[in-house]
Swiss-Prot record:
One of its GO terms (biological process) is methylation. S-adenosyl-L-methionine binds at residues 9, 85, 88, 113-114, 168, 208, 233. SUPFAM superfamilies: Tetrapyrrole methylase. Signal peptide: none annotated. Coiled coil: none annotated. It is an enzyme of class 2 (transferase). Pathway: Protein modification; peptidyl-diphthamide biosynthesis. It catalyses: 2-[(3S)-amino-3-carboxypropyl]-L-histidyl-[translation elongation factor 2] + 3 S-adenosyl-L-methionine = diphthine-[translation elongation factor 2] + 3 S-adenosyl-L-homocysteine + 3 H(+). Belongs to the diphthine synthase family. It comes from Halobacterium salinarum (strain ATCC 700922 / JCM 11081 / NRC-1). One of its GO terms (molecular function) is diphthine synthase activity. Its EC number is 2.1.1.98. This is Diphthine synthase. PANTHER family: DIPHTHINE METHYL ESTER SYNTHASE (PTHR10882:SF0), DIPHTHINE SYNTHASE (PTHR10882).
Amino acid sequence: MLTFVGLGLYDEASVTVAGRDAIAAADRVFAEFYTSRLIGTDVAALEAHHDTTIERRDRAGVEQHPEPILDAAADGDAVFLTAGDTMISTTHVDLRMRAADRGIDTRVIHAPTAASAAAGLTGLQNYRFGKATTLPFPWAHGADGVPGSVTDTIEANRERGLHTLVYLDIKVDHPRVDGDAYMTASQAADLLATNWDADALGVVVARAGAPDATVRADRLGALADADFGSPLHLLVVPGSLHHIERDALRELAGAPADAL
């Protein structure tokens, strides 16, 4: 059996009870943290909390050479961990299908995600979000500024009155950076303000799931000059706003009245 367990948003306590029980029952526990990570903890603390050993896999070890994971699942109960939910945004459906091809039973234990937190923390209605996009570091996509696909997605959503969830780039063990690199919301706002529309409304969500989670709404040009603290950050570019959403952004995110 191969069980996919989402760890939630922040630390070792963010996992669901069902996820915790699956980890406790597993013969072997694998994890990847190259797509995202739990900022409030580390692997050692996770191991101590769950009284287990976690075998960390890099991208190649999951996407190109998953045999150790699959072999463990064929021989017993294996668990595969990620931050957030294993099947949302960066999906591991390929690993699940490889297991199915080998006749290995699978199951998924879901967890809170950045997408659900963005709606819950900002007061924006979740069914009014359109297609999401990811804003990469300029050096990562090989050009200056913002890829056209990002602004095209935002504009297409806005034409339909929909909000855009903008995931911000994460680089783990990348040869261009020393350590891990996390795009901040102010960097993202600056890129969009410079290359798209400085007067457009943006909503920052910083450290969703943490005790000090922060939400701030303002024009992109103003957000570019702000400091939102430690990662992880994401950015929402709203479409048309329901009057309840306007009230929520004023009360929950400090949005200036003239920016709404």
